[in-house]
UniProtKB/Swiss-Prot annotation:
Modification Phosphoserine, positions: 241
Transmembrane annotation, as ranges: 1-21, 22-42, 76-96
Record keywords, A-Z: Lipid droplet, Membrane, Phosphoprotein, Transmembrane, Transmembrane helix
Subcellular location: Membrane; Lipid droplet
Organism: Saccharomyces cerevisiae (strain ATCC 204508 / S288c) (Baker's yeast)
Biological role: May be involved in protein-linked oligosaccharide phosphorylation since the deletion reduces the negative charge of the cell surface.
Domain of life, source organism: Eukaryota
Positions on the Cytoplasmic side per record topology: 97-256
Extracellular side: 43-75
Protein name: Protein LDB16
Residues where Phosphothreonine is found: 180, 184
Keyword ATP-binding: no
Length: 256
């Protein structure tokens, strides 16, 4: 019997501190803080006007003070109930009014929303990139605005300027090569075609064109004798008279 009593006392001596530390103290702290939170609407005016709190009044109350505190609680309960009733009545009236008279769908666009537009764009791009990475998709490049036509540079001219040793005269000469196939002195005399390589099998009845076309003779201008500039041909075409044209036709027929 003595052993049983000793074992019970030993267990109680070990269990009671554990119960107090693990259960009683946390539970008391939770209840006390919950009570302070609930009594906050009463403690604020008491602290502002009387310099005390509800816990001090309860701890130091007498019979008279108890009735005073009880009266305060009654007023508090009545005011809460009265305010709740007023809120319910006005809420019901507003609900009936809105059901009868439709409320227009009008909203006010605040100006401060445009300040967050860049942040919203960045967040949308970041979220889209994260979703694409998680799905294993390739991230599409962000579309860039088209450049202004005034900022578009000429690629050919830039290529010539980037090459070492290229100057403005070289660029002008290279560009002009596409405009005039050949350059000859202005005082160069016009040469007639006496080469036998020309296969001109024309008759007198066929219309003869005294002006040689560069697109009809592929190898006609390969020698120095038969080389003629397009500019001189154009001048001859403008200045030649009918008699000159007849003489040229006769010379060409004799050369055959």
């Amino acid at each position: 019997m003595f052993v049983v009593d000793w074992s019970v006392q030993l267990c109680m001596g070990v269990i009671s501190p554990l119960f107090r530390a693990l259960v009683q103290l946390p539970l008391s702290i939770f209840v006390w803080n919950g009570f302070q939170l609930v009594a906050l609407p009463i403690n604020i005016p008491l602290r502002l006007f009387l310099g005390t709190s509800l816990s001090r009044l309860v701890a130091q109350t007498s019979t008279l003070d108890f009735y005073v505190v009880l009266t305060l609680f009654q007023y508090f309960a009545v005011l809460c109930a009265f305010g709740s009733i007023i809120g319910l009545i006005f809420g019901f009236i507003l609900g009936v009014f809105h059901s009868i008279c439709g409320v227009p769908s009008v909203y006010i666009s605040l100006e401060w929303k445009r300040w967050f537009a860049p942040i919203r764009t960045v967040l949308e791009r970041a979220s889209t990139s994260i979703v694409n990475i998680m799905r294993g998709q390739t991230i599409a490049p962000i579309p860039m605005p088209k450049p202004n036509p005034t900022h578009i540079s000429k690629p050919n001219m830039k290529k010539f300027h980037d090459e070492p040793g290229a100057d403005d005269m070289t660029i002008t000469h290279d560009v002009n090569c596409y405009i005039t196939p050949c350059q000859t002195p202005t005082n160069e005399k016009i040469q007639h075609y006496n080469n036998d390589s020309f296969n001109t099998t024309t008759t007198d009845d066929e219309p003869t064109d005294i002006w040689d076309r560069s697109d009809t003779y592929q190898n006609s201008f390969v020698t120095n004798e038969t080389l003629m500039s397009l500019s001189n041909r154009a001048k001859l075409r403008r200045n030649a008279s009918d008699a000159d044209i007849v003489n040229i036709k006769i010379l060409r027929r004799n050369s055959r």
